[in-house]
Amino acid sequence: MRFIHIADVHLGMQPDAGFPWSEERGEAIWESFRRIIRLAGREKTDFLLIAGDLFQCQPLLRELKEVNDLFASIPETIVVLIAGNHDYVKRESFYRGFDWADNVVMLLSPEPECVEVPEKKTAVYGCSYDKKEILENRLDGVRPEGKMKYHLLLAHGGDARHMPWNPGRMAQAGFDYIACGHIHKPGILIPDKMAYAGALEPTDETQLGPHGYIRGTVDEHGTRIQFVPFARYEYEDLVLNVTEDLTQYALETKLKQELALREDCLLYTSPSPRDPKT
């Protein structure tokens, strides 16, 4: 069984608000999401797991319809998603009662629930946020059950105000893989067992380095996962060694030369200032 795990897509967000490229960044988020859908379709991936915050805020009905059409375009892939703290399921949310495509399952309940997919021999567990902050780990005590061969868990949180959890304890629950969201930096918490996919595209200048998705396989030999860089944009610290006698013109020239050596889709941040004599 093969899966793609994404999280924190934040559709509708325009990073770097106020800058000339902000609108382009917002469109890049949508385009990266479309690209991941096309990838899942080409590879006939069994599952697309979305571990919360697909949207930056409460989704509009037209946005849900757009996303649903994309999901429907990959009928051989089962899409399972939960809502996170940004797109939580409030009482008047359009998530409630939405008619998803046949290959889509949203685990809408604020309490842990499970969907079984017999043709994939897989059960997927998880719960959605019903408010911005959840101070307890609602997934504590959830264990695989039933007759399915493989068991996956979707989890959004991991900090003090968003379902705080102990990765080691969760990994001992018996799931084949725990797909995490909320933290935007990709990271393997437990090798081949539990990971943050990170934001599909970086959403601010603090999120340095590659962003993308987790690719995984579960079979009789166990679970194997790997992080795959996929984002169009990447933030990178750019450090220039300058002296106190460097003029503004010389500094700008030096900066342009450095930028010319790098890729177009890298976004640069300025780290903490250093002593100009160094």
Residue ranges and their predicted role:
Residues D53, D87, D275:
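Acidic Asp/Glu-based divalent-cation binding sites
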Residues P15, L135-R138, R224-F227:
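Short, charged, solvent-exposed linker or helix-capping segments at domain edges/interfaces
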Residues R34-E43, Y249-C265:
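A short, well-ordered alpha-helical element
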Residues E27, E111-P118, A197-L261:
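Binuclear metal-dependent phosphoesterase catalytic core
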Residues M1-E66:
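N-terminal active-site segment of His-dependent metallophosphoesterases
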Residues Y268, P273-T278:
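Single conserved hydrophobic/aromatic residue that forms the stacking wall/gate
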Residues F47, C57-T217:
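His/Asp/Glu-rich metal-coordinating catalytic cores
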Residues V9-L11, L54, Y129, L189, ...:
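Hydrophobic pocket-lining residues within nucleotide cofactor-binding pockets
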